[in-house]
């Protein structure tokens, strides 16, 4: 029996990842893990809990907020920066080869390492997470790249005594392709939340809102978030 721990932010990518894990391994073998890190959009944790409840799987939560106390990343509550209201392509053009301002320092590395500890304790041999090609493009989020995934997988596999490895099933896929798969799997997108501003109604202007809208449009699908549906209840 293979048990899987899925990093779940309550957004499109991680919810599709969760749907894929459940399809492949069965919901009785899947645990969802969500992490608080001081994000402005902590509404996403409610979304992740609702998605887990929808699938009737165990949902764990972990608070790593203190680690980022001194970070001025625009995604965090303590930041003096505003979240950019423009596409990632526009942000990258201004970044001069550096990650975008919403890049949280080594966030995925920290999340995966923490998940590895919990996975060993819970008897999970695989950690799933929803990094995809678009997030890694231009090094907007370097901890979403295939090279990073391979390096972290090797470190976790060896560091866990070969008990745990990680899989990023979408690392070679675009957001459009992720949404296509999610629609095929009937992922509960009506329960998801993505906006970096953290308001009840998505702003439609931040990088992740723009990217999400483009992915649904490319699939000729209407985003439930734009139909007035919310993630407040299952």
Task: State where each predicted segment sits.
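Short functional micro-motifs and their immediate structural scaffolds
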Residues: 26, 188, 211-214
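Short amphipathic alpha-helical interaction/hinge segments
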Residues: 160, 217-220
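Iron-sulfur (Fe-S) cluster-binding modules
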Residues: 35, 233-234
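ATP-dependent adenylation/nucleotidyltransferase module used to activate substrates
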Residues: 1-186
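Short cysteine/histidine-rich metal-coordination sites, predominantly Zn2+-binding motifs
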Residues: 198-199, 220-231
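Short, intrinsically disordered, charge-biased short linear motifs at domain edges
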Residues: 182-184, 189-198
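Glycine-rich nucleotide phosphate-binding loop and flanking beta-alpha elements
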Residues: 135, 216-217
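Local cysteine-cluster metal-coordination motifs and their immediate loop/turn environment
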Residues: 109, 113, 193-214
């Amino acid at each position: 029996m293979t048990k899987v721990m899925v990093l779940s932010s309550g957004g499109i990518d991680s919810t599709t990842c969760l749907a894929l894990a459940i399809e492949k391994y069965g919901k009785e073998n899947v645990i969802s893990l969500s992490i608080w890190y001081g994000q402005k959009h902590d509404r996403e944790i409610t979304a992740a809990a609702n998605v887990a409840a929808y699938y009737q799987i165990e949902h764990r939560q972990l608070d790593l907020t203190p680690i980022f106390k001194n970070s001025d990343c625009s995604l965090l509550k303590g930041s003096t920066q505003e979240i950019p209201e423009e596409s990632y392509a526009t942000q990258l053009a201004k970044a001069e080869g550096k990650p975008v301002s919403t890049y949280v320092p080594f966030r995925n590395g920290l999340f995966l390492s923490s998940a590895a500890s919990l996975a060993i304790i819970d008897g999970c041999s695989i950690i799933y997470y929803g990094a995809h090609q678009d997030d890694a493009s231009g090094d907007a989020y370097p901890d979403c790249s295939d090279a990073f995934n391979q390096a972290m997988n090797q470190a976790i596999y060896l560091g866990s005594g070969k008990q745990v490895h990680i899989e990023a099933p979408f690392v070679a896929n675009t957001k459009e392709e992720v949404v296509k798969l999610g629609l095929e799997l009937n992922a509960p997108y009506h329960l998801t939340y993505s906006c970096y501003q953290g308001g009840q109604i998505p702003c439609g202007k931040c990088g992740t809102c723009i990217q999400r809208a483009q992915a649904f449009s490319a699939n000729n699908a209407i985003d439930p978030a734009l139909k007035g549906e919310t993630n407040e209840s299952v």
